[in-house]
Amino acid sequence: MSDGLPPQVRLANEISIQFAHLPFADGVERVATHMRQFWEPRMLRALLAYIDAGGPDLDPLAAAAAEHLRQPA
């Protein structure tokens, strides 16, 4: 069954669910760490493009983590 979401959005939302029990800032860091360690750069670029286009179906935790990764290290 497909929900019509781009794969990187669906995956980011699924990852966020795993860290939703944490305080928001901790969850952002954990999701961002996961993305940094396991995602190919093109996946993150696609997710950031989705956010830039409005990203209506992205979990707030996933969106904050992606924005965190947008910042220079």
Q: Each PLM stretch: what is its role?
A:
Residues A66-A73:
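Short, charged, intrinsically disordered terminal tails
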